[in-house]
């Protein structure tokens, strides 16, 4: 994970969609029920990604491709490591109904006094949750605790 985190520190934009590739981004080739992101790794590099993280050895056609056992697991671990290095409190909201609305209300109230970071919309799933902390690349590890 340290190698992947070092790459992330140099190229902090994460993408899981080749339509969203920015210069120097890292493309994570996620798999779904009807798609395999490994098929798009070369395209991501062609579009400007600095690296592509893949989990299919057959997809490795370039030295900028990082082979991992599971791309989703690697993304989740990268997010966990990045979040661990940020000295900011976290607030979690759970329940059956109303989580997104509650999150929006709480974040707006807290934003009156604090700098607040929250998931966009309802990206509160196994993919959206790790994409949230890795988007906080402008925060330095162990800064202040004014963020929520």
Label the model's feature ranges.
Residues 75-143:
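Phosphate-binding loop of NTP-binding sites
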Residues 1-77, 81:
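N-terminal leader/targeting and accessory segments in enzymes
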Residues 147:
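Cationic, low-complexity basic patches in intrinsically disordered or flexible, solvent-exposed regions
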């Amino acid at each position: 994970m340290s190698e992947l985190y070092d790459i992330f520190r140099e190229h902090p934009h994460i993408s899981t969609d080749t339509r969203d590739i920015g210069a120097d981004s890292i493309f994570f080739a996620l798999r779904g029920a009807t798609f395999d992101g490994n098929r798009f790794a070369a395209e991501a590099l062609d579009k400007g990604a600095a690296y592509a993280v893949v989990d299919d050895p057959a997809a490795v056609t370039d030295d900028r491709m990082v082979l991992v056992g599971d791309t989703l697991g690697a993304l989740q671990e990268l997010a966990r490591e990045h979040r661990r290095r940020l000295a900011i409190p976290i607030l979690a909201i759970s329940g059956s109904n109303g989580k997104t609305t509650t999150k929006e209300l709480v974040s707006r109230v807290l934003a009156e006094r604090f700098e607040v970071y929250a998931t966009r919309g309802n990206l509160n799933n196994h993919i959206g949750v790790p994409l949230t902390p890795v988007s906080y690349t402008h925060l330095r590890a162990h800064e202040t605790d004014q963020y929520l």
